[in-house]
């Protein structure tokens, strides 16, 4: 799979693709994110690792305002996510404005969340037609091209139940790309797959990286992080514990918590 660059929206502001400043998130009394500061640059593959419950997936969901942050600021391509600032005050955006921001952000979940009553092709066409108002002809042409790119051109008429888990996840990636996002968020995209199916999904993500897609990837696939990642953050207990180039962090961790975690997964 190559040649996806025409389906990748380019950043427009000259700002970092993602910037988090003191991001906190609480659910009731549970303090999940405890002051996250990080920067993701355009075209970067940014990997988040850490134990379950460390806040990785919650942070990912905050980036596109599926979860509202409790304090701090989150920016995507220079735009404040979910809010408008006037003076010192923040005003929450209307749902229509939030939806417009989300159009630039593709998200791929652990579970594929495909519409079971739609074919692979229809799943990929749905959002461009319903959300962006594209004609079916335009949406179909892009959907067919994207399914070809993820190696499923011969499965476009299949329903999700007729596809393997790896094939369903590749359809989900094509569906996210159909909106021509400038940023892709991957929340443990291989964790629900049988081991023999993991490689085909990682191959698609590797090709996306080569085509210049900015990606934030929550993953337990340390080999992928080492080979493809540009930056890596280890999170634990809602905090960024350690960050750096993946090879440096994975081969020479500096923090005891990072060392303990990696000793169990490598």
PLM feature spans:
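Short, low-complexity, intrinsically disordered N-terminal peptides in bacterial proteins
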Residues: 1-13
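ABC family nucleotide-binding domain
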Residues: 13-246
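C-terminal boundary and immediately downstream tail of ABC-type ATPase nucleotide-binding domains
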Residues: 2-4, 234-237, 243, 247-266
């Amino acid at each position: 799979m190559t040649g996806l660059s025409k389906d990748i929206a380019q950043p427009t502001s000259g700002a970092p693709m993602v910037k988090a400043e003191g991001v906190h998130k609480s659910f009731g009394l549970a303090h999940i994110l405890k002051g996250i500061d990080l920067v993701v640059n355009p075209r970067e593959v940014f990997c988040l690792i850490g134990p379950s419950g460390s806040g990785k997936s919650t942070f990912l969901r905050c980036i596109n305002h599926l979860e509202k942050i409790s304090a701090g600021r989150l920016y995507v391509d220079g735009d404040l996510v979910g809010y408008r600032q006037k003076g010192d005050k923040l005003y929450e955006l209307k749902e229509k404005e939030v939806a417009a921001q989300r159009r630039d952000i593709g998200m791929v979940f652990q579970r594929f969340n495909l519409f079971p009553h739609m074919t692979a092709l229809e799943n990929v066409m749905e959002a461009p037609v319903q959300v962006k108002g594209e004609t079916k002809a335009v949406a179909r042409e892009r959907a067919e091209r994207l399914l070809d790119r993820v190696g499923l051109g011969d499965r476009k008429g299949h329903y999700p139940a007729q596809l393997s888990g790896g094939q369903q996840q590749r359809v989900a990636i094509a569906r996210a790309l159909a909106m021509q996002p400038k940023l892709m968020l991957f929340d443990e995209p291989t964790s629900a797959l049988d081991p023999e199916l993991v490689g085909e999904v990682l191959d698609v993500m590797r090709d996306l990286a080569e085509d210049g897609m900015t990606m934030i990837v929550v993953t337990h696939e340390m080999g992928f992080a080492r080979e493809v990642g540009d930056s890596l953050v280890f999170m634990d207990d809602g905090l960024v514990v350690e960050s750096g180039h993946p090879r440096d962090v994975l081969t020479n961790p500096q923090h005891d918590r990072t060392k303990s975690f990696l000793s169990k997964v490598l």
